[in-house]
């Protein structure tokens, strides 16, 4: 006997909860909608409908991956970020809501400015900024050629004119720089992370040395004279001190949606 969509969701939610997933019901809904090829809203309307055999098999396969703590974004192959949807896979860090604060800073630069997204990964910050401020010239830089493949594919699919270059922070960036946005590795080595992160996301995009500041220190030293720099960080006070010592005068710390101090903004 085939189970209803509602029953399938209930069982899946229980399974994911037992596996330790933080949002089991939401995850189950997203995966079932994917298996059925419908929007999540349709699951409510069709809750009493039986789940077909083919959809059931697809759903079970997706659930098995999530129960192994693979992130939903990697399972689906996409992640929403501000007003765009990005393709993502284990070559790049999954864009997170707190990183949207970097885009908000980028939106404040003068018309026609040139902004560099350092450590661009999937291209999330660069592409979201260009989408909302087409007047800007935006360049994405990353040390990973694999990540740049993902970023360029996202730009092409979204039809956004953003260049991406292989490089180490600001080394090799020529021409004027009116703003720098950076989500660099800032997790200290040895810090325990959730399985979704530790097992699946690229370590090079996460860990920033013994105190998590190795890469950030290098960028701060390179960015002297840049009108504005914004960085997502784990130690906002330490980063603020680095920026102050580098000669930046106006420094503020922005909170994310969870009310954590997450982004440091400095103006020269």
Regions found by a protein language model. Give the residues of each.
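Non-catalytic accessory regions of SAM-dependent methyltransferases
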Residues: 1-44, 51
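Conserved hydrophobic residues forming the short capping helix/wall of the S-adenosyl-L-methionine
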Residues: 16, 155, 243
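Conserved AdoMet
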Residues: 30-105
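Residue-level signal for inorganic ion chemistry
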Residues: 31, 69, 99, 125, ...
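Conserved beta-strand segments of alpha/beta enzyme cores
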Residues: 85, 137, 161-163, 249-252
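Conserved SAM/SAH cofactor-binding pocket of Class I
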Residues: 94-194, 235
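Mobile active-site "lid"/loop adjacent to the S-adenosyl-L-methionine
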Residues: 184-215
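Conserved Class I SAM-dependent methyltransferase catalytic core
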Residues: 210-266
